[in-house]
Every structure is written in structure tokens, then in C-alpha cells.
């Protein structure tokens, strides 16, 4: 297989918090110097592409904001294909910005969708409204299934849990491991799955999403998953490396 396109996860692969993984800059610049289409993909919906580019620049890694693709962007792309343009949103600036760009009206009056991302201001009233709207027919869409991040701060999946319990309806999660976000990233690059590799640190999200979308997969051991985890999974990554610094197949 000749790799012509690269999708790469961010946290645990290229960054640890706000510190670059050793070799990350060289890895990314090597891909860009070869002219390969690149998407840096994250499940977290709370930052814009420019926010992420600034985060990388602060860590000494210069990449354009155009290479970033977040679950908020993917959610907006998903919703562009659906009927209805009114949404009740549990989320913050980056998600709301993407929804406005997609032509949505943000409202708490008869919404077509309840869209959940991530926010630190989640409260009883938000949960009540979201559950009420979902129980009464609003379509339940969420950016990503992650329940928590580093330090156990609640993430989108945790915010959805109460709404799901009250309404009896499960959300459609746009982010990994859903193959939908991978196909959306491929569309962004105008790429084909059989010519694309995804690099990730999490077997249950990055590698599973790539596997389900028909991509070659690279697991790096600088983040969530370890070699011991591989034996518990029904699928295997195409390649395994200690970190991006050692990847030699791209």
C-alpha cells in the first residue's frame, strides 16, 4: 500500500496537555514537506482550528489552522445533511460557532435537534430542557462519546448520560469511534480510505474508527493504549510504534 493521506489524532499522539510529544514537529513537517494531505483530528469540540494552531505554536509546532478537524466541525457537517435548522445546544463557543456557520438557529423553543458538546456551565435546567425536547421528538446528536478527560473532568458522554436516562433515547455520537467522522475527514481531504492511514493512541476510538472506515491504522504507545490492550481487542492495528518519532511507513 502507498500511503497518500494522513489522519492523525492529537492528544497522546502529538501533544501531552500543552507539551509536544518528542518528534511531533518533525513528523508533521515531514508529512507536509512530502505534500501529503493531512488532517489533525480531535474528538474534543471546545476549540476552533485557530485555537488549536495557537496551542501547537506555543508548544513549538507550527501547523496551519486549516489542517485541524474537530468533532464540532464534523457535527456541523453532519447536520448540514439533515432536515431542520433549529437546535437546542449544550455546549460552548466553538460548537456554537460551527452551527451558526452551518445555518442553524440556536433556540429553546421547539428545536429540531438537541446537540450536546462540552461545557463547564452544565446545570439542572439544561439537562431538563434537553431531556424534555428529546423525549418530545427532537433528534439527539452529540459530538463525542468520551465520558471524561485528564483529571476526570466531565466530557460529552457524561453530559449525555442524564439526558439519555431521563428521555430513554440514546444520542448519535458523531466523533470517534464512529466511522462518520473519519469519512467526513476523508471528504475534507478529498481522499479515499484505501490510500489513507490514521495514527492514534487509543484502540477503542482512533484505531476502531479507522478500522470501521477501511483505513490502515497506526497505534502509537505514547498515550492511552498499551501492548497488553491489543490482545483484548478483536482487531489489530496495521502497525505499532512507540511514538510518532519512530514511524517510518509514511
From Swiss-Prot:
Catalysed reaction equations from the record: a ribonucleoside 5'-phosphate + H2O = a ribonucleoside + phosphate
EC numbers: 3.1.3.5
Residues annotated as binding Mg(2+): 9, 11, 201
Coiled-coil features, chain-numbered ranges: none
Cited InterPro entries: HAD-like_sf, HAD-SF_hydro_IIA, HAD_sf
Signal peptide span: none
Site entry: Orients D-11 for proton transfer during catalytic turnover: 55
Top-level taxon in the UniProt lineage: Bacteria
Active-site residues (renumbered): 9 (nucleophile), 11 (proton donor/acceptor)
Reported induction: By N-acetylglucosamine.
Binding site for substrate: 11, 42-43, 176, 202-205
Cofactor, how bound (note): Magnesium. Can also use other divalent metal cations as manganese, cobalt or zinc.
One GO cellular component term noted in the UniProt record for this chain: cytoplasm
Required cofactor names: Mg(2+); Mn(2+); Co(2+); Zn(2+)
Record-level Gene Ontology MF annotations: 5'-nucleotidase activity; magnesium ion binding; phosphatase activity
UniProt keyword list: Carbohydrate metabolism, Hydrolase, Magnesium, Metal-binding
Annotated site residues (Confers substrate specificity) in this chain: 146
Quaternary state and interactors: Monomer.
Family: Belongs to the HAD-like hydrolase superfamily. NagD family.
Record's function text: Catalyzes the dephosphorylation of an unusually broad range of substrate including deoxyribo- and ribonucleoside tri-, di-, and monophosphates, as well as polyphosphate and glucose-1-P (Glu1P).
Protein name stated in the entry: Ribonucleotide monophosphatase NagD
